[in-house]
């Protein structure tokens, strides 16, 4: 028959978001269980993550996504040190190959500034080539976002899960959630 789980909080999914939620909730006096249909954490969508820590210049101005991009970018390096997973602030270049594309770079620059992204600038010529020497000669300009970074999605998700488990979160793997039913005691 169906298994019943009697915790204060049940998190469905052991990807990056589920493990981050588990880790955060593990700081509180709660009985937390993370349920994952796979055999381990980070076996679904998170394993195919691009690994980019977005600076926040491309999210719609003032949006929740922009806020989370900027705040996440600012906090990720400290989190990587705390939990010991790979992080590299290598910056990002949004390339422009023709004059007609320059207004788009200006738009991204403005959007990023509205969103609170620090250090954005449009670079050209020698400054652009100094940032990326192997760049195509056809590139005429770029938006440079020095706060963009990359992480190891596996390393981060595993580190979050390990910390959550150390703090008392229970993990149930190979467990599929088929139904959630409301009861007098909750769900």
Predicted regions located by residue number:
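Helical element adjacent to the flavin cofactor pocket in flavoenzyme catalytic cores
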Residues: 143-187
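Dinucleotide-binding Rossmann-like beta1-alpha1 core, especially the glycine-rich loop
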Residues: 51-131, 140
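Glycine-rich FAD pyrophosphate-binding loop
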Residues: 26-47
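Short, flexible, mixed-charge acidic loops at enzyme active sites
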Residues: 44-51, 135
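Short phosphate-binding/catalytic loops that engage adenosine nucleotides
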Residues: 30, 117, 169
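Beta1/beta-strand and adjacent pyrophosphate-binding region of the FAD-binding site
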Residues: 2-17, 33
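Gly/Ala-rich phosphate-binding loop of Rossmann-like dinucleotide-binding domains
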Residues: 22, 26, 163
């Amino acid at each position: 028959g169906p298994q019943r789980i009697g915790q204060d909080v049940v998190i469905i999914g052991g990807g990056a978001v589920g493990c981050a939620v588990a880790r955060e909730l593990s700081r509180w006096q709660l009985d937390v269980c993370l349920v994952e249909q796979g055999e381990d954490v980070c076996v679904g969508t998170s394993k195919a993550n691009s690994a980019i820590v977005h600076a926040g210049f491309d999210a719609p101005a003032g949006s929740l996504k922009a806020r989370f991009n900027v705040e996440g970018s600012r906090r990720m390096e400290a989190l990587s040190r705390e939990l010991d997973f790979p992080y590299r602030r290598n910056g990002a270049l949004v390339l422009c190959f023709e004059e007609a594309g320059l207004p788009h770079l200006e738009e991204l620059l403005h959007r990023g500034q509205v969103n609170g992204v620090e250090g954005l600038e449009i670079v050209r010529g020698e400054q652009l080539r100094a940032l990326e020497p192997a760049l195509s000669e056809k590139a005429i300009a770029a938006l440079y976002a020095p706060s963009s970074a990359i992480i190891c999605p596996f390393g981060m998700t595993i580190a979050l899960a390990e910390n959550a488990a150390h703090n008392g979160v229970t993990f149930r793997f190979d467990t599929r959630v088929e139904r959630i039913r409301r009861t007098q005691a909750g769900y």
